[in-house]
């Protein structure tokens, strides 16, 4: 794809899935024609607690939340990436993952990525202690997918702090890497832009990062600043704090020139041990 139009939705999701879906659809309705891919943030369909995540977790390619997104993709004729939602583990039905799902414009599930790195940290904010591993099983596989806008590598939020994952996605042919996120206000203000631009520069990929913004319950506050960064590290679009869509035009034609002039992939002497799970129609039907 030489040029493509993408919309990154900045949301303030909460505990009510219907309200969250309505918020997503309202933003999609306001988009101009020509948008090929819509990306949503982490926790796009549900921003709640462990009990609620377990209650709403769905089977792969089956469930009411996925059906709503499937119908939305068909209705508006766009690809939609759900930044993350709770899913039942493919390895064990007793465990859940926080997973990013990619649907095509016909509503078919084309790719799934289970978040690899769990946000188990202590932050100097009201919430204080974050322990995703108490709720979720970490993923173990890379996911890359062919889309109308280019070859897409998938990550989620805290994954942004682990450059080896991004290098592995680049090695699997990623031209674009998505980073749906719910960065805290504290960590976002300090690190968000720096990390996004660094990952773009290091891997010579376009970075697309849809974000949560605002307050979610009594103790959670997210940074927002949805952002798109080109392969040279230039910010090509950002939305600081509005609950609205960021529309950007991306192009991947310059990637070849940048990569030929500075062949960092060939120069890299470190190899990831992660096993790639390439997305295709066979994976989607499992």
UniProtKB/Swiss-Prot annotation:
Name this protein carries in UniProt: Deaminated glutathione amidase
Gene3D superfamilies documented for this protein: Carbon-nitrogen hydrolase
Enzyme class: hydrolase
Family: Belongs to the carbon-nitrogen hydrolase superfamily. NIT1/NIT2 family.
InterPro entries: C-N_Hydrolase, C-N_Hydrolase_sf, Nit1/2_C-N_Hydrolase, Nit1_Morganellaceae, UPF0012_CS
Annotated TM spans: none
UniProt keyword annotations, A-Z: Hydrolase
Function: Hydrolyzes deaminated glutathione (dGSH, 2-oxoglutaramate) to alpha-ketoglutarate (alpha-KG) and cysteinylglycine (specific activity 6.50 umol/min/mg), has less activity against alpha-ketoglutaramate (a-KGM, specific activity 0.20 umol/min/mg), very little activity on glutathione and none on L-glutamine. May function as a metabolite repair enzyme.
Species assigned in the record: Yersinia enterocolitica
Active-site residue numbers: 42 (proton acceptor), 115, 157 (nucleophile)
Gene name, Swiss-Prot/TrEMBL: nit1
GO MF, one annotated term: deaminated glutathione amidase activity
